[in-house]
Amino acid sequence: MKNIEIEDDLYAYIASQTQHIGETASDILRRLVMPENTVVKTVVAAKPSATTKKPVGDVFSQITTDELSEYPKMVERFLKILSVLESMHGAQFDEVLTLSGRNRVYFAKDKETLLQASSVTNPKQIGESTFWVMTNNNTAKKASLIKEVAEVLGYNANDGQRLAALFAPELYED
């Protein structure tokens, strides 16, 4: 593993290209600069097939662009969306605890678990729930986490993308 120094604007661009939780800078750069026919040694673990979970209620009637615009800070929007999802899904929301990066824990049942994983996680409680989330990620990573949460709760990819676009519309403008 080699370390390189890059300018802030380039770092921000690379970080904004994150497509899923746990994707490393090397993964992102490979995807961006290597031709598709280049062989890269990767191991893909197959997910066991499970019965498809159905989302409970209409999340889009409870999270609107107007409502989210009342939250000027991205971390507040992030927490609002997670809070609505948690309140709609109850015990099923426990499945977010399975989401983690290679060396990161994103969700926990208590603040201490996140602080033990890293002292710079800036953990925040999700609404009035017993769940906590790491918040020191950039906007693109938070949007990616929202999509991952939606997926584990049974939403299709399109709805996960819609939730992420509600959170950070500037990331999804054409």
UniProtKB/Swiss-Prot annotation:
Transmembrane segments: none
GO CC annotation terms, alphabetical: cytoplasm
GO annotation terms (biological process): negative regulation of DNA-templated DNA replication initiation; regulation of DNA-templated transcription
GO molecular function: DNA binding
Cellular compartment(s): Cytoplasm
InterPro entries: Arc_rbn_hlx_hlx, Ribbon_hlx_hlx, SeqA, SeqA_DNA-bd_C, SeqA_DNA-bd_C_sf, SeqA_N
Keyword match Cytoplasm: yes
SUPFAM superfamilies: Replication modulator SeqA, C-terminal DNA-binding domain, Ribbon-helix-helix
Pfam family, one: SeqA
Keyword DNA-binding: yes
Keywords: Cytoplasm, DNA replication inhibitor, DNA-binding
Similarity-based family: Belongs to the SeqA family.
Known function: Negative regulator of replication initiation, which contributes to regulation of DNA replication and ensures that replication initiation occurs exactly once per chromosome per cell cycle. Binds to pairs of hemimethylated GATC sequences in the oriC region, thus preventing assembly of replication proteins and re-initiation at newly replicated origins. Repression is relieved when the region becomes fully methylated.
Subunit structure: Homodimer. Polymerizes to form helical filaments.
The protein, known as: Negative modulator of initiation of replication
